[in-house]
Amino acid sequence: MSLRRRVLALAFLFVMVTLLSAPWLQSEDQGVPHFNAAAPAKGATIEPILTKDQLWGENAQFPYQTHAYELAAKIPNVIYQMPCYCYCDRGMGHNSLHSCFAGTHGAQCGTCLKELYYTYQMNKQGKTVKEIRAGIIKGDWKQLDLQTAASIN
């Protein structure tokens, strides 16, 4: 096989592998991310939500990031039962939206933040965990504006 044919074959192979593995060509429907179907068992402990000091120290960025952690600490058993559509269950080993706020990931991810604020609002309106989860799966959280979220109480 000539050198030119080898180069062309390798170039073709490279292009095909690149195209087939490109994220923009993959289906947007990756299924429902992992969540816990029920609240933690009575007496079981779950990882605590980070506090403001643990999260930022002196490096606070946007008020809605810190405020999300304050709200998450009010509803840990609810967010424990919610999926997270940034798919951190696959890349980071998270098992629910709660995992995002037990670490710093939740502050850095718009998806996690929007889902948290959506969950908090729906919980405050008296929606059940199943109703809130159905809204998250449907994508209702996507409409939330993070710039105004810090005023949600």
PLM segments and residue spans:
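Secretory/periplasmic and organellar redox-cofactor proteins
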Residues: 1-73, 120, 124, 129-153
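Short, intrinsically disordered, charge-biased short linear motifs at domain edges
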Residues: 66-77, 87-88, 96-100
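Short secondary-structure junctions and interdomain/linker hinges
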Residues: 75-82, 143
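Short, thiol/selenol-centered motifs that function as redox-active sites or metal-ligating centers
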Residues: 82-119
